[in-house]
Amino acid sequence: EYSPTVVIHGIGQSKTYLYENDEIAVDEDGKQITGWPIYANTKYIIKNLLWPLVKMLVTQRDDGFVESFRKTLEGTLYVNAFDSNGKNVYDVRVKKYPQSVAKCSDEDKEEIYCNVPIDGFSKVAGEDHLYYFAYNSFGNNSEITDELYNFIGQIKRETGHDKINVVAISLGGTIANSLFDRYPELYPSLDRVVYIVPALDGSNIVGDIYLGRLSTSDEMLYKNLLPNLVG
């Protein structure tokens, strides 16, 4: 018999929603406002960026576009705003799957298998021994780690197993490493740990951003970046 497996997904492989008055918030068109997938109000974006973009392309210089873009981006991504302690500014909640995949609805199963193609594995190990840990990819690492630790405890109680498999994908590798560092007492409970294209050692790109090594010159923007983006 196989040990139960918990899958820790990668970035953006879960849904998050903005809540107001304990209900999912909607915009003026009745569309649910999500943190991920990123909620984009097309009318708002076009209204704020179209004219500044046209002016920039015609004049080949920043004629207010960068500032307009900054404000528009801020207004578009506001749902995912965090304070200095890594806490959500707004009430953003993750869609959770607190039970085994076997007990999930057909809709939830489809979401899980669409995010991570593990249906082949589930046919071998059994959906009743497969769990999907959903978390906010932009959330507080410590809080997510604590949630995962408690989730693993729940899985062991539900299945009656003493050991568990951990499958960490992409950003999930960072979460798994945090788990093992924060809760070393979990080691005896681990059967197998599988990392799939994991983010284990940080990112060179993020390091370059912090060190100011990214070019922001007009030449880079207008002659290199934009033409490549447009194709």
Residue ranges and their predicted role:
Residues 1-167, 171-225:
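N-terminal non-catalytic accessory region
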Residues 226-230:
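Long, compositionally biased eukaryotic signaling regions
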